[in-house]
Every structure is written in C-alpha cells, then in structure tokens.
Amino acid sequence: MATMSASISGVSLISRIAARTYLRGLAAAEHGDFDQVLRQFAPRCELIFVSRTALGARLSGRADLLRWFERFGRLLPDRRFEVLRFVAGGPVWDQRIAAHVIIRSQIAGAPYQIQFAHFLTLRWGKVVEDLILEDTATWETASRRLAAAGYPEAAEPPLAPAAA
C-alpha cells in the first residue's frame, strides 16, 4: 500500500482530503488498477512525463493515458510508492499538488529505487494536468537493463498520441 512519510497534520481539510485521494491513486497504481487511477482524471487530462525513454510522453485523453499506465505497469511490476513530501494548495476548483515520491520495484531481478517529483493540477477534484519529473539518469540505466533482460518495450521511444 502506498505510504506517506510526510506529515499532513496542521493543514487544511481540503489538503488532507487531497493527500488521502493522492494516496488512493498511488495504491491503485501499485495494484495495477489503472481504471481506478483514471477515474481521478478529467476526460481531457494531459500527462507529461519528461524523458526520452519508453515512459516519456505528452499525452491527453483517457485512452492515451491508459496506454501510458499499462506500459508503466509492465516496465515496473510490483511497484511500491512512498511519499516523502506532499504539498497541496488552492481552492477545490483550481487545486495544485506537489509531491516527492520514491518508487521501489524490481528491475531484471534486482532491487530498484527511483525518486520523482509529481505536480498535479486539479479542477473540482479531477486531475487536468499530471507532470512527472523523474531521475532520468537512473531510469535510463534501468531501461537499458530491462531491454537487455528481454523487455524490448523498455528500449522503445516515448509514447506518442494515438492516431484519431
């Protein structure tokens, strides 16, 4: 289950609700329940993962986001999230979330850990923008290890929007 090391005491009720919702989304991602994750997204949400690797993307719409989450799930099985820092602010109609997160998993049979910064914009509780800034050097090394271990998808280029 996704965990939060950061304290959320002393913050507004809206921020505490945002933190619980965020953790539920990470927990769903841990279990591969990407439909549940996408229920938290607005229909035209934009996901930006800054990278030249297989996880790199600038996508919008639930169908393309599902493709990204499915690839993420295949490349990082048995993932676990730990939120180290969490900040939420703004009214429910224009809320911003920033989180510093650690992912632990297995890459080609060896323990793997990476950190990323996660920035979300929500409108009325739905994610409209999801920006992920990950330790790209660590992920690029992991991608090469995955490809060498028989996961050719790890060597593929970033996802492009599906043709309409």
Where are these regions (language model features)?
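C-terminal and inter-domain tail/linker signature
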Residues: 2-164
